[in-house]
């Protein structure tokens, strides 16, 4: 089944979509790195990470929705769903394999990006890879990965339940906008909005001190990792129990 998924994914340009997402992330990373005050910034890693997370807040839902749409859409062509079901394969198993493949691609992309972030942060003399920083890196790496996987699962559910061909892409844009809105309006809503979770792990807080703003580090947010894992578990349970699917769509 794994080899079959790889064969089906050929020609879908999944890697091209991931490359575009990487280019967007790289742009945000380099913007933070190239600022005039970066070399003297007290929190170089946090500075780059926050730029990376802020851009991910809007673009990741759209990119991940596009990836999910591509791998589901291929099944709708040439009656692939019916063919595989007739061979004894369950729709749930096919979906889980697709989710695994996309999650691995996102995981590999994220490893490369985070290594690059750490490498660039190390260019600042204030960067010190102490226990607290290592803990923050590990927790937020896992949190970011969990958020991405939870969105893959959510878009898979939307794609398999929706009858409209472009609904999931429209939903991803609305979701991305909702993430930005909740970031600007409510910490509580950001914490429960699956598309606003990136905003809850921003590292730097700006506090007004007279006429200037000073930077302080936020405490590590462990709750977001827990919430994203809950979304993953609930989505997997939902997919496993699905008994009605939309295997073709209206334009």
Tell me what each language-model feature is.
Residues 26-64, 69, 96-162, 172, ...:
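Secretory targeting signals
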